[in-house]
Amino acid sequence: MNASRATLQDLFDQAIALHQQGELARAERLYQQVLLMEPASFAPRHMLGVIRFQQGRNAEAIDLIAAALQQNPQVAAAWVNLGNVQAAAGHPEEAAASYRKALQLEPANSQVLNALAAQLLRLGQRDEALSAIDQLLAANPGDIEARNNRGNLLRDLKRYDAALADYDALLTVRPDLAETWTNRGAVLCDLGRPEEALKSLDRALGLQPGLAVALSSRGFIQRELARFDEALESLARALAIEPDYAAAHGHRGKTLSEMGHLPESFQSFLRAGELTYAARRPGPDAFAHEQQHEQEQKDWITASGEVGQGPLHIVGGARLSGRVVNLHNRDGADKAWRESDPKIVVIDNLLTDEAVAALRRYCLGSRIWHTPYSQGYLGAFPESGFAAPLLAQVAEELSVTFKDIFATHPLRYHWAFKYDSHLDGIGIHADEAAVNVNFWITPDAANLDPDGGGLVIWDKAAPLDWGFAKFNADEKAAYDFLAKNGAKTVRIPYRANRAVIFDSNLFHKTDAIDFAEGYENRRINITMLYGRRRR
């Protein structure tokens, strides 16, 4: 079809005007009319793709914009739009590639650098995301959002001093930013400076009294300082402002747990899990072992006929009418604890058969495994719904059954890990608590190495002046310390329904895992931490 250049331009200009006014259907017709007249035209095909994106038709949008870019790959805005659609469609790797194409054409485009950083974070490429933000700040040193985001990312990378420096630099020129005062408070807490952290949060609340995130962080830090009533008051204020604020429910659960109010604590944890994870499923960019677990769990639920309850599909987990912790271990375990140095006690047949079976059913059927680790295992934490009344019953009975071990230590935190069949396990670390309880609930028949699969504990404790980041995550420092002090290991093989109870400050790691294939054969361990680490 022949048409003058002026006619085509006039039609396209009309389409753009209608598009800008939100008249998508009329704009679409004009774009299509231009394409009929000039099929090789880049601009109308690109803009049709934009309309498809606005209509939520992402697959068509990707096809249209990609086709336009084949005709003219030198338009940065089109690469940006393609990246935006790919990001919305759940394709972060493709989106990052498109944003990089745009940056080749416009290297200092702050919008694109921000978008690229966001996709790199989705991909877990935090160092690369930091590089993108650094490029943005090199071009735009005064970009407030980028500076704040850089601080947040440095905190995620556990580079706390650098994060604090970014927040301080930003607050020097913009002391009115309540969010940044809040972030500063969080990183000061990470650095073990809770009193300074509270002052920073108070600055945030002075600027914005209804800032729920600051109130929630304030409650978290007050709990760390054992100021439990104040913590509950701060968290109540946060939840009055944002009743569905998951983090505040989680912090409330931790506070109530240390106060000894486990039923109420676990209700708060469950609410946090429902708010955060009810609709979450592994996406296309999830780890392969996470996707495999999702499918295996679906198949198990279908085959077993289990009907889950609530948004997290909780299977079982109710309190049992009788005891769950066996009494026959009591005197021997307490005596062993009193006499052992270092404090390490192994208890076999910890729980009743009924309790073990109920816990296995709960762990197999409930959708609570929401924290994947690249090494090949999944975590279930209280805030993701790992808060069954049966777990509270176990925690309570442990305290009253083994009084010499637990003394007055309350339950501080708990979690579970579920592993792939063949792994090295979790690396060396110590935990932020007084007493560590680690028990296992997968049948012995699943363990292909009866002499392994359990726990390795060193007979030397982490130095008391080491901070959490060092004793919990710095493996090199731990091994150097142990070698220097001639530490020896205690290797405890895996056994179903075996508990290892030990001083949480002792360095330990999961032994190498060699379990049979199959969903029900996955190694599951449950950890409960009691009390606070010595200072």
Q: Predicted regions span which residues?
A:
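Conserved alpha-helical positions within TPR/SEL1-like repeat arrays
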Residues: 12-20, 43-54, 77-88, 111-122, ...
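TPR-adjacent "capping" and linker segments in tetratricopeptide-repeat scaffold/adaptor proteins
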Residues: 1-10
